[in-house]
């Protein structure tokens, strides 16, 4: 890599980290290309980003972001997973690490907060923004559905009374 390529890599990673709601640092020693490709695809499907970068360049890219404190986690062969959804990157990394012992979660960050391994696992156990939105819509729709059922119930009962009265008259 020449100086211009390094500068481009740093600015690209800095832009990604500046927009990220959470960042997860993983150690990827021993991952095969196929396993790494599967992990990258899962991250992409979840709207997350997964990059293997030189630690020195990653530390430079962290400057000027809210994640400057996680630079100390960048030792050895590491990769950075980031996402605009606060739980997406953590959730995918933790799930992948459960099935593949070659991927080790080192830590991460969420805003100014530095997370250890347990913090990342706790973050991964939270529901995603889409799941929370679905639950909220369900909670908001439930009372409206009940109100509609209650409002329709007297009319239905009245119709049944008239129907029974009409059947009684006809008989």
Curated annotation (Swiss-Prot):
One of its GO terms (biological process) is translation. GO terms for cellular component: large ribosomal subunit. It comes from the Bacteria. InterPro entries: Ribosomal_uL10, Ribosomal_uL10-like_sf, Ribosomal_uL10_bac, Ribosomal_uL10_bac_type, Ribosomal_uL10_CS_bac. GO terms for molecular function: large ribosomal subunit rRNA binding; structural constituent of ribosome. Keywords: Ribonucleoprotein, Ribosomal protein, RNA-binding, rRNA-binding. HAMAP family: Ribosomal_uL10 (MF_00362). Part of the ribosomal stalk of the 50S ribosomal subunit. The N-terminus interacts with L11 and the large rRNA to form the base of the stalk. The C-terminus forms an elongated spine to which L12 dimers bind in a sequential fashion forming a multimeric L10(L12)X complex. Belongs to the universal ribosomal protein uL10 family. Forms part of the ribosomal stalk, playing a central role in the interaction of the ribosome with GTP-bound translation factors. PANTHER family: 39S RIBOSOMAL PROTEIN L10, MITOCHONDRIAL. This is Large ribosomal subunit protein uL10. The lineage of its organism: Bacteria, Pseudomonadati, Pseudomonadota, Alphaproteobacteria, Sphingomonadales. The gene is rplJ.
């Amino acid at each position: 890599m020449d100086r211009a390529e390094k500068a481009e890599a740093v600015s690209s990673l800095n832009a990604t980290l500046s927009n990220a709601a959470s960042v997860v640092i993983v150690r990827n020693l021993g991952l095969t290309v196929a396993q790494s490709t599967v992990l990258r695809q899962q991250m992409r499907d979840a709207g997350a980003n997964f990059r293997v970068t030189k630690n020195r360049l990653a530390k430079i890219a962290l400057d000027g972001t809210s994640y400057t404190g996680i630079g100390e986690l960048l030792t050895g062969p590491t990769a950075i997973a980031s996402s605009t959804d606060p739980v997406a990157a953590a959730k995918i990394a933790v799930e992948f690490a459960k099935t593949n012992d070659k991927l080790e979660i080192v830590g991460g960050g969420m805003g100014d907060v530095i997370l250890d391994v347990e913090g990342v696992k706790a973050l991964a156990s939270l529901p995603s923004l889409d799941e929370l939105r679905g639950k909220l819509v369900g909670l908001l729709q439930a009372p409206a559905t009940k109100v509609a059922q209650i409002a329709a119930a007297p009319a239905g009962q009245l119709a049944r009374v008239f129907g029974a009265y009409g059947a009684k008259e006809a008989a």
